[in-house]
Amino acid sequence: MVRLLVIIERSDIPMKTEIIKTTDVHWDEKVKHLGEIIRNGGLVAFPTETVYGLGGNGLNPEASKKIYAAKGRPSDNPLILHVSSQEEVSRLVEDITPLEKKLMDAFWPGPLTIVFPKKDIVPDETSGGLKTVAIRCPALKATREWIKECGVPIAGPSANISGRPSPTTAESVLHDMNGRINAIIDGGATDIGLESTIVSARSGKIVIYRPGGITREMLSAYGEVEVDKGLASPNMHPLAPGMKYRHYAPTAPLTVYVGDTEKVEQTILSFAEKKDKTYGYFVSEEMAALLPKDAVVFSWGKRSSQKEMAHRLFSGLLYFNAHPVDAIIGEGTSMNGLGLAIMNRLTKASGYHIIVESTQDR
């Protein structure tokens, strides 16, 4: 009897995801290895000052397709290109206006993404089919070293399953991406905790497509600033990354209350008296102090510190995935400063379920 041994290569077996720390004593050698992964068409999650990104060769259409597949992200949602310096931009874009150059000089390296008209070298798979491309230079030195070693711009949306909160630690990346990508660069917890601000500066004024760590007030020092009207619409066509589709959503439905502080407190406290569901509370320290001791609470910090709220925003949304509740009751903030970016994320996380409380409701 002749036995035939057939070996079948299974595509459903996940790859092994390795974790490499930026503090590794052999970091210089690891950077070369990580660069090789990218040049070979692989995917590497990487830290920035904002959130962790999911990186691939931004000039390789197949690598961009892999990014969309790993995230479960619609392919008409464009990807940001990350560069290690300003000098890398000119080969990717048609031209650079004086205002764009001013913004790069002022905020790069840092959490500002600028939308440019792209050259053909940037594939449609990366730009989401648009004739423009969004580019930024991250602040984290280790990440810039790695991008330089790669020799190509890195296409990098946030390193999470599409629709979920963006990751601010390597552990959160591993939870979503283990077996989906080749490697994770562990640079510790991110500093800002919100994604970059995305702007266009083509028309002589600065248009904010996505608010972030660089605020409207900071940008106003360099020209007239306008907030794109599409930020308030759930059905708009994406002109820049992160403008379309539900984002940042925890597993449980989220409702956010803003407005008159006393009225917001009364409304949130009323849920603590209800027994129909298990509620979680994503609120300020001041509000948390008023809730029952046995309530499921994640405090985003003091009302006076939007920076702390921004830093803890995504970790708070992820907290309620690890501590399941039927519904989440959130407390919002004003639209000034970082509040514009914070409320943008909460608006999307809640599926546009924002309730404004006023003294007239009493």
Named regions from a protein language model:
Residues D12-R362:
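Active-site-adjacent structural elements in enzyme catalytic cores
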Residues M1-P14:
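N-terminal amphipathic/basic-hydrophobic helices that include classical n-h-c signal peptides
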